Amino acid sequence: MEDMYDSFAALSASESEYRIIYEEKNGSELIVLGPHGGRIEPGVSELVRAFSDRCSIYLFEGLKQRNNRSLHLTSIRFDEPLALEKVNDHHYALAFHGYYDPKIPHTLVGGADRKKAKLICERLNEAGFSAELTNEKDRLAGVHPNNIVNRTKREMGLQLEVSTAQRNALFRNFGCRDKSYIQNDLFDRYVEAVKLGFYT
């Protein structure tokens, strides 16, 4: 599906029901971000926040009652100024995204940092999760230099595309619109597996 806007400037001129969250982890070279958080891609914000123990975090969250899809800016177009500044301040970046597949719990691991992507994929598999390293030519590979996650000091980052079914499996009440999602044991196991790869 095409984005409604082609830049953050265009989006912010027409939309107001969103919020931007940035929490600095002093001295950390790591940042974890969710450019499609809140109601844009449900479950992404919770995953990002789970990394605040050792990472700076950035979230762009949709807050609309409906049609949060209009707040979606594809990662290579995601040029929100604070995100650009803060990702560029860090050496390592990991972005969580959600893709639509309500049947198969799965994670597509990509980004220009292929070495760490392979490591995260292996750690997820070892923890019992279905995950695969994206082909660099795949639509969701996340290797484009303009992708927000690759705009680090090292000019590379990591992108995790998590299916609807996998996100659903990580919470007791996924899809409940008016309540905070309650994380389950699987959530903790998933996050721990990603951390083992990312923090190495």
Swiss-Prot record:
One Pfam match: Gamma_PGA_hydro
Gene3D superfamilies: Poly-gamma-glutamate hydrolase, zinc-binding motif
InterPro entries hit by this protein: Gamma_PGA_hydro, Gamma_PGA_hydro_sf
The family this protein is said to belong to: Belongs to the UPF0714 family.
Name of the protein in its database record: UPF0714 protein YjqB
Organism (species): Bacillus subtilis (strain 168)
UniProt lineage: Bacteria, Bacillati, Bacillota, Bacilli, Bacillales
